[in-house]
Amino acid sequence: MWNYLFGGNKQQKKEYPKKAIVELREHIQMLNKKRSHLESQIADQDALARKYITTNKALAKNALKRKKGYEANLMKIENQIDSLETQLTSIEGANLNLETMKAMKQGAQAMKQIHGEYDVDKVENTMDDIREQVELADEISEAISRPVGTEFVDEDELDEELAMLQEEEKEHKQQTPAQKAPVAKVSAPEEEMPDFPTVNKNKPAASTEDDEDEEALKALQAEMGL
């Protein structure tokens, strides 16, 4: 223990809390067994005293004395168990705090290592580089999307050529004679068709003469283009 407090191997210091916890638990377990044994002995002596209380007072008295001795030992054992359990709880809590501190320390070291790779100035420089590259990409995109060849055309020359074309079109219209108004074509009156007797299709043919009249009518219509 003194080596743990004032020096000694680091690995031993690391394992000492765990070892102390294990030993305390084992000792408490042993004391609990001892307490159970004393409680059994107290019960036996109490039963023996009750058995001889009327027939043999000397045996009953000796049994009570042994019972008192066992009860005194039981009280000491229970006090020891209480002390060890209190100490065990404290050590477990301290060990838990130690493990928590170790985890927090490792987390702090990890953050320190991460932040060691960059700082505020490096972040600002990186953001400036990003903005510069974005602007460059926009310029490149604009240059690529610009029509090829149109930048070499003279706008004044185009306006002059357009004015010449308009002047030529104006002169051409002045030189072209006015066209005569179209004369409406008078169509000849259609020749009226003679009235023909209506033929009842549902009525059966009365005679061969009616069939001949029907054939003549069809021939006349075909001749007239109807």
From Swiss-Prot:
Spans annotated as Disordered: 164-226
GO cellular component: cytoplasmic side of plasma membrane; ESCRT III complex; multivesicular body
Membrane topology classification: Peripheral membrane protein
One of the protein's GO biological processes: vesicle budding from membrane
Record's subcellular location: Cytoplasm; Endosome membrane
Chief place of localization: cytoplasm
Superkingdom as given in the UniProt entry: Eukaryota
Stated family: Belongs to the SNF7 family.
Binding partners and assembly: A component of the endosomal sorting required for transport complex III (ESCRT-III).
Function summary: Required for the sorting and concentration of proteins resulting in the entry of these proteins into the invaginating vesicles of the multivesicular body (MVB). Also required for the proteolytic cleavage of the transcription factor RIM101 in response to alkaline ambient pH.
Protein name: Vacuolar-sorting protein SNF7
Species assigned in the record: Debaryomyces hansenii (strain ATCC 36239 / CBS 767 / BCRC 21394 / JCM 1990 / NBRC 0083 / IGC 2968)
